Curated annotation (Swiss-Prot):
The gene is rpoA. Residues 1-231 are annotated as: Alpha N-terminal domain (alpha-NTD). It is an enzyme of class 2 (transferase). Residues 248-328 are annotated as: Alpha C-terminal domain (alpha-CTD). InterPro entries: DNA-dir_RNA_pol_insert (IPR011262), DNA-dir_RNA_pol_RpoA/D/Rpb3 (IPR011263), DNA-dir_RpoA (IPR011773), RBP11-like (IPR036603), RNAP_asu_C (IPR011260), RNApol_insert_sf (IPR036643). It comes from Leptothrix cholodnii (strain ATCC 51168 / LMG 8142 / SP-6) (Leptothrix discophora (strain SP-6)). This is DNA-directed RNA polymerase subunit alpha.
Length: 328
């Protein structure tokens, strides 16, 4: 009796025009077409890395509800049009680009000044229209990311000193526009109960359908690899090993009050459940700056006090907190 599962032997990629393609894989054992097709589709739509504008500064504009003299669209519509520009960054994770245009006519994505390692996929995309004597001067920050990130959820390390006029955008990083799949019947010799997986993939051009399917498969393999590494009895799978006893430097077990920080800094730390020096040194500068009412001045004070004791932020402590430590 045959016990080995069939694996796909034929993989065909048929371009459908634009940035669309049909990917066909066969044969699969019955049921595997839906199992893998659904998993790949979900990963493609949710987990692909892409690029999107995340911040914009427009000369003469203080907020997104403003208008710009000589520009047909208001700022909200300019931002919506800007989200339609497809960027691709090579060997970098973020970049700030400049767009300057004067005179009557459309403002297109091709008017954005780009360095050699930044590519605009749809240069004819219209961002705005200028009237006679109109002028548009803006800076656009483009970042690498994954999924959809609302502007209201994005935090910045320099938020306490955020400049007036910087508009934060909702960012849709996903380069996938549409993914669908169907499962058809396949045949191998005398077997007719097999699956053929047919996927139609459409991207925005920042990534090809072939690259997208490879990247999604790689993500699935990496996520599932941990299950292939399970060893030992069934009991060992579900029982976590007992943590090894670890001795910490006594200074890490002291309360943050002993650092003699200002009342403002000490209260900010306690509000974040940071009671011990060991709790504090595991936080990064970025994490501390997100603490309400704790600004750059307080952060510098904390860093100086820690440095005087030979400590720094961003440390890693295994098995922290130790057993019996009162978390108050």
């Amino acid at each position: 009796m045959q016990t080995n599962l069939l694996k796909p032997k034929a993989i065909n990629v048929d371009p459908l025009g634009g940035h669309r393609a049909k990917v066909t894989l066969e044969p699969f054992e019955r049921g595997f077409g839906h199992t893998l097709g659904n998993a790949l589709r979900r990963v493609l739509l949710s987990s692909m890395v892409g690029y999107a504008p995340t911040e914009v500064t427009i000369a003469g504009v203080l907020h997104e509800y403003s208008t710009v003299d000589g520009v047909q669209e208001d700022v909200v519509h300019i931002m919506l049009n800007l989200k339609g520009v497809v960027f691709r960054l090579h060997n970098r994770d973020e970049v700030t680009l400049v767009l300057r245009k004067e005179g009557e006519g459309p403002v297109k994505a091709s008017d954005i000044q780009t360095p050699h390692d930044v590519e605009i996929i749809n240069p004819d995309h219209v961002i705005a229209h200028l009237a006679q004597g109109g002028k548009l001067d803006m800076q656009i920050k483009v970042e690498k990311g994954r999924g959809y990130v609302p502007g209201s959820m994005r935090r910045y390390a320099d938020e306490p000193t955020k400049s007036i006029g910087r508009i934060v955008l909702d960012a849709s990083f996903s380069p996938l526009k549409r993914v669908s799949y169907t499962v058809e019947s396949a045949r191998v010799e005398q077997r007719t109960d097999l699956d053929k997986l047919v996927m139609e993939i459409e991207t925005n051009g920042a990534i090809s359908p072939e690259e997208a399917i490879r990247a999604s498969a790689k993500i699935l393999v990496e996520q599932l690899a941990v299950f292939a590494q399970l060893e030992g009895s069934d009991l060992a799978i579900f029982e976590a090993p007992a943590p090894r006893a670890q001795h910490f430097d006594p200074i890490l077990l002291r309360p943050v009050d002993e650092l003699e920080l200002t009342v403002r800094s000490a209260n900010c730390l306690k509000a974040e459940n940071i009671y011990y020096i060991g709790d504090l040194i595991q936080r990064t500068e970025t994490e501390l700056l997100k603490t309400p009412n704790l600004g750059r001045k307080s952060l510098n004070e904390i860093k100086e006090v820690l440095a005087s004791r030979g400590l720094t932020l961003g440390a890693r402590l295994e098995n922290w907190p130790p057993q019996g430590l009162d978390k108050r």
